[in-house]
């Protein structure tokens, strides 16, 4: 199942949510993975809190290390491979329906970065984009950049991700997408977005962030060295 989310001032920018069926066990596994990663960075890589957080201005040490790990590497959890296929199927549908790319021409070279965000009391993500300044600084050409978020666990109250109009005259207009556990929302990487705050005094807000890129083949190795990307469709080979 999928949901199309809103129109920006008459301009349709594809912000599309896909629903993972029966997400309870997957989400429990993802909470365990995110908690374990957070413990590692807090206890072993304490100084990494000074790393870039991608413009989100969050206190979450995981977000400050978003390019240092990939949740999809954790294949000791049986649900991760199934989840990766769901992500792949969702991106396939999005690419075929909402982009000018031919999926059969891009699927062999789509790479995905997938990290965890864990927001505590009062925390939220400031307005930011996922378009990589690292790649543009090094003059790498990205034929395709698509991002996503996956909602793992609510803090116990409604939260929203707000997607802002890319039209200069309407920069403060946004489409709010209610966060729902088990929903994967795909959007163009250039779209600015932020989140509402976690108001719970005791519970964290768990999500995954994702970037999918399709680098030119001659630049792929150099681009991949900047992160911990996995080939999205490698399990199909």
Task: Say what each PLM segment does.
Residues 1-102, 124:
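Non-heme Fe(II)/2-oxoglutarate
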Residues 21, 119, 151-153, 211-215:
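Solvent-exposed residues in well-ordered beta-strands and their adjoining turns
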Residues 73, 78, 98-105, 125-127, ...:
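Short helix-to-loop capping/linker segments positioned immediately adjacent to catalytic or ligand/cofactor-binding
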Residues 108-186, 196, 203:
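Catalytic core of non-heme Fe(II) oxygenases with the double-stranded beta-helix
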Residues 166-237:
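Catalytic core of Fe(II)/2-oxoglutarate
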């Amino acid at each position: 199942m999928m949901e199309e989310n809103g129109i920006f001032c008459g301009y349709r920018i594809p912000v599309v949510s896909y629903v993972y069926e029966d997400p309870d066990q997957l989400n429990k596994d993802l909470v365990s993975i995110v908690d374990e990663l957070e413990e590692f960075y807090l206890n072993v890589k304490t100084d990494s809190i000074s790393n870039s957080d991608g413009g989100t201005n969050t206190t979450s040490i995981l977000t400050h290390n978003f390019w240092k790990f990939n949740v999809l590497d954790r294949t000791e959890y049986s649900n991760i491979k199934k989840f990766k296929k769901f992500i792949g199927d969702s991106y396939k549908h999005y690419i075929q329906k909402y982009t000018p790319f031919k999926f059969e021409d891009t699927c062999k070279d789509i790479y995905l970065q997938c990290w965890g965000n864990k927001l505590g009391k009062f925390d939220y993500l400031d307005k930011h984009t996922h378009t990589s300044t690292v790649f543009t600084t090094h003059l790498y050409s990205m034929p395709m950049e698509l991002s996503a978020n996956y909602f793992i666990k609510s803090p116990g109250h409604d939260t929203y991700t707000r997607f802002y109009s890319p039209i200069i005259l309407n920069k403060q207009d946004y489409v709010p997408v209610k966060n729902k556990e088990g929903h994967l929302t795909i959007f163009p990487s250039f779209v600015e977005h932020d989140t509402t705050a976690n108001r719970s005094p005791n519970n964290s807000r768990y999500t995954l962030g994702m970037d999918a890129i399709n680098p030119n083949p001659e630049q792929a190795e150099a681009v991949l060295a900047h992160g911990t990307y996995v080939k999205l469709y490698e399990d199909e080979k």
